[in-house]
């Protein structure tokens, strides 16, 4: 049973959301009194409650979504709240839909988006994975963080070929290593206020680490927002090379570490926006003519299911007219389709820029 103190906090949180008239988050939209009363006394087998799910959105009324899953079971137990939010965010993925089986497709059908290097500064494809048998950040113990870091570092240190590299634990990291990783834009910081409020940063920096290959085109974050963030990137617009490297890496890691997968939702992640393929394929791109009117840029982008962000990602501005543009859809389509959607959309934006 959920204790009285938690119930009190839940009621206060619910009232706060109700009273926040300018709050536009999905948690406010879908956490009705009926849903709230249905879920407030439930607890997962690892002890997570509705409070763990909604507290980031309660604390940060400017959240876009406002909920996180403290463990895999939360997606099922708190489905009356997660399902409509998933459907709203992953446009039209209803509670009766199932995410298709994983399919990375034929990488050879992709190419270089910008062979003349006029527009695309860099290309990046990432995915998130959770380790089977472990909860997500808020429910992890210090011992589990350490255990996961050991598993992940030994797996990654066994990679060879172009993926061969070094694992750097955040604990006890030398200042010069830290500075180098910051200069490379590889180092992740302790979570932002959204993650902090979701209790995603406990025991920091225990269990956190960064791996990168010698060429600095392949990167893995261990226990940042998700258990694993697997990232492939390089300068220029050669999406085929970037994607092929990611696919190779995911397959190699999965041989050694089983990932957490849900029959209906695909690969499970801490934040419901990343479910399904978990794939985010993005470019840093300069489109000076289109970007002169950001509203128009966003209109065109949304036609191709693309998301426009500032240069440094979410909640940032575009520096020097450089935008971060990525696929928006991650659920209800295959990995290949998600990447192809970005490929086709960016190709179209470049065409429009050239004719503007």
UniProtKB/Swiss-Prot annotation:
Key word Nucleotide-binding present: yes
Protein residues bound to ATP: 122-126, 185, 229, 280-284, 309-314
UniProt-listed InterPro entries: ATP-guanido_PTrfase (IPR000749), ATP-guanido_PTrfase_AS (IPR022415), ATP-guanido_PTrfase_cat (IPR022414), ATP-guanido_PTrfase_N (IPR022413), ATP-guanido_PTrfase_N_sf (IPR036802), Gln_synth/guanido_kin_cat_dom (IPR014746)
Catalysed reactions listed for this entry: L-arginine + ATP = N(omega)-phospho-L-arginine + ADP + H(+)
Assigned keywords, A-Z: ATP-binding, Kinase, Nucleotide-binding, Transferase
Gene Ontology MF terms: arginine kinase activity; ATP binding; creatine kinase activity
GO biological process: phosphocreatine biosynthetic process
GO cellular component annotations of the record: extracellular space
Membrane spanning stretches: none
Domain Phosphagen kinase C-terminal: 119-356
Residues reported in the UniProt entry to bind L-arginine: 64-68, 225, 271, 314
Residue stretches making up the Phosphagen kinase N-terminal domain: 9-91
Enzyme Commission identifier(s): 2.7.3.3
Domain of life: Eukaryota
Family label: Belongs to the ATP:guanido phosphotransferase family.
Protein name: Arginine kinase
Origin species: Artemia franciscana
């Amino acid at each position: 049973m959920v204790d009285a103190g938690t119930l009190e906090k839940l009621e206060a949180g619910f009232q706060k959301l109700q009273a926040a008239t300018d709050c536009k988050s999905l948690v406010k939209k879908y956490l009705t009194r009926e849903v709230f009363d249905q879920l407030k006394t439930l607890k997962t087998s690892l002890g997570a409650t509705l409070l763990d799910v909604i507290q980031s959105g309660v604390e940060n009324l400017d959240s876009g979504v406002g909920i996180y899953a403290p463990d895999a079971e939360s997606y099922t137990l708190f489905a009356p709240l997660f399902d409509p939010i998933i459907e709203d965010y992953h446009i039209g993925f209803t509670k009766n839909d199932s995410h298709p089986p994983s399919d990375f497709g034929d990488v050879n059908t992709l190419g270089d988006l910008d062979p003349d290097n006029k527009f695309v500064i860099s290309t990046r494809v990432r995915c998130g994975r959770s380790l089977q048998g472990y909860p997500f950040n808020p429910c992890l113990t210090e011992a589990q963080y350490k255990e996961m870091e050991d598993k992940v570092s030994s797996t990654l240190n066994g990679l060879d070929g172009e993926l061969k590299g070094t694992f750097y634990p955040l604990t006890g990291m030398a200042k010069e290593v830290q500075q180098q990783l910051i200069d490379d834009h590889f180092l992740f910081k302790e979570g932002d206020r959204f993650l902090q409020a979701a209790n995603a940063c406990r025991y920091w920096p225990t269990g956190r680490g960064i791996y990168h290959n010698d060429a600095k085109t392949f990167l893995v974050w261990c226990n940042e927002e998700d258990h694993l963030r697997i990232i492939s990137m390089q300068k220029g617009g050669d999406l085929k090379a970037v994607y092929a490297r990611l696919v190779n890496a995911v397959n190699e890691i999965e041989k050694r570490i089983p990932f957490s997968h849900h029959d209906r939702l695909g690969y499970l992640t801490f934040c419901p926006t990343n479910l399904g393929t978990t794939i985010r394929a993005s470019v840093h791109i300069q489109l000076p003519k289109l970007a002169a009117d950001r509203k128009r840029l966003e209109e065109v982008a949304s036609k191709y299911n693309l998301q426009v962000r500032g240069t440094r990602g979410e909640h940032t501005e575009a520096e020097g007219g450089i935008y971060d543009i990525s696929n928006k859809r991650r659920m209800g389509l295959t990995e290949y389709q998600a990447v192809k959607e970005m490929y086709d959309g960016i190709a179209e934006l470049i065409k429009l820029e050239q004719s503007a």
